[in-house]
A protein has these predicted regions:
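Cofactor-pocket helix-loop regions in the catalytic cores of large enzyme subunits
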Residues: 1-181, 196, 200-216
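N-terminal beta-loop-helix "entrance" segment that forms/cooperates
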Residues: 184
Length: 216
């Protein structure tokens, strides 16, 4: 989680809900999303299913299962085409942007529409709505992660958020709803014994990089 649940449901101007049916799987979050909609928050649902919240959505993109990466690339293609990226955030807080531009340049709305079985204009509208909203979190669940490309799907959504500067701010971020109680918290706090060694290596590597950067 990059943001607390209360923050993303009470402070968001738009919510992008991807591969998640919180009213059934996470009812407290589902209730909070409905409350956010009542106060005027926009909702984009990205899900092949006709979930309850899709009836309240401004846009419902019914992706073909397993095409989340292409969808995210298409969103980023539109953001760049429309000049809606956050250049300051990208320059100061990201790396590899030119490589990402090269990857997504061929994922036009028309191409993504064919891959994902969605309407190209709806994809454009969703991308522009997401980019222009001041505070817009992405909330996702197992509908993204339970694929062979689950990791890539999450990374692609993270790239989306960074492209428009929606990380590290109130009412934004990339936020997973998981399958068991506090499984995300355990991972975020490096308490998962399955990955403890890998996490330690990453922390050490980051420490070394920061030390070199600041001449320590």
């Amino acid at each position: 989680m990059t943001n607390p649940i209360e923050d993303i449901t009470k402070n968001a101007d738009l919510i992008m809900l991807v591969g998640s049916n919180p009213e059934e799987a996470h009812p407290v979050v589902g209730m909070q999303i409905r409350q956010a909609i009542k106060r005027g928050c926009k909702l984009i649902v990205v899900d092949p299913r006709d979930i309850g919240l899709a009836k309240k959505a401004d846009i419902h993109l019914k992706l073909k299962p397993g095409t989340n990466v292409a969808f995210a690339n298409g969103i980023m293609n539109v953001i760049l085409s429309e000049g809606l990226q956050d250049d300051k955030f990208i320059a100061e807080r990201t790396e590899g942007f030119e490589e990402l531009k090269e990857i997504v340049k061929d994922y036009t709305p028309e191409k993504v529409a064919e891959i994902c079985h969605i309407d190209a204009d709806d994809l454009r509208k969703a991308a522009i709505m997401y980019a222009k909203a001041d505070r817009a979190p992405i909330i996702y669940c197992l509908g993204v992660t339970e694929h062979s490309t689950g990791t890539e799907g999450v990374m692609s959504m993270s790239n989306m958020a960074m492209m428009v500067g929606k990380l590290g701010r109130e009412g934004c971020g990339v936020n997973p709803l998981r399958g068991q109680n506090n499984v995300q918290g355990a991972c975020d706090m490096a308490l998962s014994r399955m990955y403890i060694q890998d996490i330690r290596r990453l922390l050490i590597l980051q420490f070394v990089r920061n030390s070199r950067k600041h001449g320590v």
